[in-house]
Amino acid sequence: MVAQGEVRSGSMTQIAASDDSKRSAKWQERREAIVDTSARVFARNGYHATGIAELCEVNGFGKGAFYYYIGSKEELLAAIHDRVMDEVMLGADRVAEAGGSPSAQLAMLGEELLDVIHRYPDHVWVFLHEFPALTAERADQFRERRREYERRVEAVLRDGIATGEFRDIDPWLTARAWLGMHNYTYLWLKAGGDVSARDAAKPFADIFLHGIARPTGGAPA
């Protein structure tokens, strides 16, 4: 989790759309719809294989109108990344506010993350596969936002080690094992599927927490 008083880095799209707050609510709504529709196209075709003409067609805009809402194709990619990170960080904030033991917080973080993956499968596909296409400052901001979330997970693990709840594990490596376990559910965790985010969250937590828990009696593993 982020330490008290730490300033969170802003969304990448603030670079190219710093005047968004001056736009109308209708403009924002239409822009968000473009982001969502384009995420589906990128997830189906890939970012580099998708041209502006196709994006205009699926969104029902001419090129001039499209650029009124989206400054560039890369800005659109950044907005998709921001959609994922905004939702993930909101979930992490809810976990921090709820408090509880390190085990409870790690389980809640998992449920929140799986919920985002379940609700935004196309955005998450783009997030995981197309981030190398971000350049310069956008790439730097994405890495920092991703690292901020990783620090939250690592902090929960460190708390568990400090209290004796978890074994003496490497927080950095363990966080990445935890993230890998959850992130790639995008391959099969689909809205309307047989398994919901909540269905997956409990067994995931059980498997992971049993793996890192200190054995009963406090004997070192």
Language model segments and positions:
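Amphipathic, non-transmembrane alpha-helical scaffold segments
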Residues: 27, 35, 77, 81, ...
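Amphipathic alpha-helical packing segments from all-alpha helical-bundle domains
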Residues: 86-93, 137-162, 172-176, 199
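Hydrophobic alpha-helical connector segments
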Residues: 79, 93-122, 174-178, 201
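Amphipathic alpha-helical segments used for helix-helix packing
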Residues: 105, 117-137, 187
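Helix-turn-helix
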Residues: 33, 37, 41-75, 79
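C-terminal peripheral helix-coil segments that are non-catalytic and often amphipathic
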Residues: 1-18, 112-115, 119, 150-162, ...
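Short, hydrophobic secondary-structure boundary micro-motifs
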Residues: 125-128, 169, 219-221
